[in-house]
Amino acid sequence: MTRRFFLVLLCIIAAGAQASAQAKTTVVILVRHAEKAAAPAADPPLTEAGVARARALATALADANVRAVITTELIRTRETARPLADALGLPLETVHTGTGGVHARAVADAVRAHAGQTVLVVGHSNTIPLIIAALSGPKFGDICDTQYSNLFVLIVRPGDKKTGLVVSSYGAPSPDAATTCPGSMK
């Protein structure tokens, strides 16, 4: 799995360099927030495992040429993104949660405001698939509630009707979705 991760990271870096060469090609990296505490239920912070995953994300993307970081207003997305944003000296751009499709389109608009750059989006298990679809990526099933290690990479080119998607992982492995959430994305 480590080898696969580094191959994907190499692709991200290469795509970032390509994005610089092609003025409007945008690399979008999407992750679900890291592991969250059980309370408070409405807006929990990260657990110790989540804090470790947020640091792993910062390490994994340190050389990926990220130029913008988009989160929701919820603590768990902001805490997941903050180590990378702080390391790169980038502000966290907030897109408020709301109805799924409306939120996904708002995130897609925020990404498009950074055309030609590499953008990190930290979302939720129920918003990441919608955001990918809003950016013309392929549709897929829900992300299992126990899955935190997925890393999705989209290469968005102006005029393309469909956007390619690479799925990888980072940090500690999540439990096997086949046993914890049958029928969801693995």
Located regions from the model:
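Positively charged n-region of N-terminal signal peptides that target proteins for export
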Residues: 1-4
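Bacterial N-terminal signal peptides
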Residues: 6-16
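Sec/Tat signal peptide C-region and signal peptidase I cleavage site
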Residues: 17-22
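Active-site-proximal alpha-helix that buttresses catalytic centers in soluble enzyme cores
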Residues: 23-115, 128-130, 134, 139-151, ...
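Long, charged/polar, surface-exposed segments that mediate recognition or autoinhibition
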Residues: 125
